[in-house]
Amino acid sequence: MDPSLLLDQMLQDVSNLPAEFRYMLEEVGLEDEQCLELRKRYQQKEGILHKYIKQNGSLAANPKEDELLAEVEQSMAQVRELQEEKCQRANTILFLVSRHLNKLQQNIIMLEEDGLLAPAEDEMESGPDFSRESSVVGSTVSERKRKAASEDHPRRKKQSRSMSNTHREKSYNKGDDTADVKSPASTEREGTLDLQNYQEELFSSMNDNEKEDQNLYCFCQRVSFGEMVACDGPNCKYEWFHYECVNLTEPPKGTWYCPDCKQEMSKKLKKKKQ
């Protein structure tokens, strides 16, 4: 395998990412502004209610209380919806970064196995020439060394609490001119796709030629599909789980551990107490 060809392909794969990320971050910024405006709105309504109580006492009925409370609840629901959309966009960015780092890692392994690239450990021992490794690549290689259970189960860094695995394979048609490729972000700008369809198109467009996400995950040992959640256990055997396999219907709040990791942590806790 020619290293220059791998480099050219990698650069081609990531060439559209800056525009995609810029668009998604701009959308997050706009949603932040909407959230702030909605917060001001419902805080103003709450202020009216508190002012009435101060002036008339808590026992006096406010004729506008039901109307004001309904407006407060509506604004809070809109804020919650916007926050969820922001999380989806952030998860999309993190997922794409992780995906390309994983591909870069696999290319490094391939070159090392072909003898075209010295292993990372040998380079560090032979001298201070780290030109091949940026801090990101170095951390990726370390992750590979730590978690290389098998080639069928490459570990993805825990970049999000959960992610939508609608990244079905569709060709980027690499022979075409880059200018002719219409990005999912530009499609959404035209208003033809909602957020969910945008994510589906974004993930779909990545990997028909790469065929790199046929790995098996979860207790069920099936490929990724639907919603998936990452276990926060540092030594989790599977790391990613389908919602249905762990009885989840929505993203968990805070830290989440799979049943196996919970059991292992419980055993360690009992040993410490003894």
UniProtKB/Swiss-Prot annotation:
**Where on this chain does Zn(2+) 1 bind?**
218, 220, 242, 245
Annotated region (Disordered), positions in chain: 121-194
* Record flagged with keyword Zinc-finger: yes
User: Does Ligase appear among the keywords?
Assistant: no
User: Which amino acid positions bind Zn(2+) 2, per UniProt?
Assistant: 231, 236, 258, 261
Segments of skewed composition (Basic and acidic residues): 166-180
Q: Which PROSITE patterns match?
A: ZF_PHD_1 (PS01359), ZF_PHD_2 (PS50016)
What's a GO cellular component annotated to this UniProt protein? cytosol
Q: Which UniProt keywords apply?
A: Cell cycle, Chromatin regulator, DNA damage, DNA repair, Meiosis, Metal-binding, Nucleus, Zinc, Zinc-finger
Domain of life assignment: Eukaryota
PHD-type zinc finger span: 215-264
- SMART domains named among the record's database cross-references: ING, PHD
* Record-level Gene Ontology MF annotations: histone acetyltransferase activity; histone H3K4me3 reader activity; methylated histone binding; zinc ion binding
* Record localization: Nucleus
Residues at the site labelled Histone H3K4me3 binding: 217, 228, 232, 240
Gene Ontology biological process terms in this record: DNA repair; meiotic cell cycle; regulation of DNA-templated transcription
A Pfam family annotated for this UniProt entry: PHD
What the entry lists under InterPro entries is as follows:
ING_fam, ING_N_histone-binding, Zinc_finger_PHD-type_CS, Znf_FYVE_PHD, Znf_PHD, Znf_PHD-finger, Znf_RING/FYVE/PHD
Q: What is known of its domains?
A: The PHD-type zinc finger mediates the binding to H3K4me3.
Spell out the family assignment given in the record's similarity comment: Belongs to the ING family.
The record's function comment reads: Component of the NuA4 histone acetyltransferase complex which is involved in transcriptional activation of selected genes principally by acetylation of nucleosomal histone H4 and H2A. The NuA4 complex is also involved in DNA repair. Involved in cell cycle progression and meiosis.
| Subunit organization | Interacts with H3K4me3 and to a lesser extent with H3K4me2. Component of the NuA4 histone acetyltransferase complex.
**Protein name, UniProt field:** Chromatin modification-related protein YNG2
